[in-house]
A protein has these predicted regions:
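Extracellular/luminal regions of secreted and cell-surface proteins that mediate adhesion/ECM remodeling
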Residues: 8-297
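Extracellular or exported targeting regions of proteins
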Residues: 2-3
Length: 297
């Protein structure tokens, strides 16, 4: 069969006509085989969206079989606020083929911490075991009020030589399928659950929490709060890189860690209290300009 990108999308995405079609092989399978695959897919989705149990299920094992593959998109939606703070959005996504499933269970001696465990599944979606991967912590700040996994991603501002300049204080995250990133990867879940923080991250009285990043989906955070955004005060004008790193302490088990990091080049200019940023283009995508908050001051 031949599939094609329609004209208006070719124009919008600047795709050449010669590159806008592709031939794919279509296999017609017997109903019995198709039903088996559908049952396995549904079983995997049920496993992902089931509420977290109050205790560990299964046995501790060394990871085997399919694993998730965490990757970082280049930082985006970059702007300067109040002439001083470099805001950005960051997305870490799972290229699969396995979902990332992390359960947290409340500690008895510290009510603000949960012990976190990553679950592993075979190709049919059946759980085969788990392994400890750190902790979750209760974040009672306004705008949060949910459980954060503490070793999911990290953000840094690096100089032109990619040496550390500023480190974001945002170190803990609630995992949720906030964005569809690439549903063409093998075993992508086209209809993920837990797509917002309210359904994924538990409450203050939760005994257990299940946080999931499905195959093909990403978790996006906007860094605009002081301490999470980068403070440009005292920094020289020039070239910098916004670093986004997935699984920074490598506590999570995944198929590869070689693709965890991304770097977005930015150029800082202006004077103290009136800084500006120019963002380097990535690939063929042209981002719409973002008005710096300081422009109205």
């Amino acid at each position: 069969a031949t599939i094609a990108v329609t004209g208006k999308y070719r124009t919008a995405l600047k795709i050449k006509a010669a590159d806008s079609t592709a031939s794919v092989k279509v296999n017609v399978v017997a109903a019995d085989d198709d039903e088996k695959k559908l049952r396995a897919s549904n079983a995997q989705r049920q496993t992902n969206r089931a509420p977290a149990p109050t205790k560990l299920v299964g046995t501790a094992v060394k990871p085997t079989g399919p694993l998730p593959d965490l990757r970082s998109l280049p930082a985006w939606s970059i702007s300067v606020e109040d002439g001083r703070y470099l805001n950005f959005s960051a997305t870490v996504w799972n290229a699969g083929p396995s979902p990332l499933v992390v359960d947290g269970f409340r500690q008895t001696d510290n009510e603000d911490l949960m012990d976190a465990y990553q679950y592993f599944f075979d190709a049919a979606g059946t759980q085969v075991g788990y392994s400890p991967v750190g902790t979750m912590e209760w974040d009672r700040r306004d705008g949060h009020n949910h459980w954060h996994f503490t070793d999911f991603a990290s953000y840094r501002l690096l100089d032109k030589d990619k040496k550390l300049v500023v480190r974001s204080q945002k170190e803990a995250f609630c995992l949720a399928n906030t964005d569809a990133v690439d549903y063409t990867v093998p075993d992508a879940n086209w209809k993920p659950d837990n797509t917002d923080l309210h359904t994924s991250c538990g409450g203050e009285t939760s005994i257990g929490v299940r946080e999931v990043l499905d195959t093909g989906s990403g978790d996006t955070y906007a860094q605009y709060l002081p301490g999470q955004s980068f403070d440009l005060k005292g920094l020289k004008n020039g070239v910098y890189y916004i670093f986004v790193g997935a699984n920074p302490d490598k506590k999570l088990y995944e198929s590869s860690t070689s693709n965890n990091n991304s770097y977005r080049k930015v150029t800082i200019s202006g004077t103290s209290g009136h800084r500006a940023v120019k963002v380097a283009k990535v690939g063929i995508i042209t981002e719409p300009p973002i008005k710096d908050e300081d422009e109205d001051h």
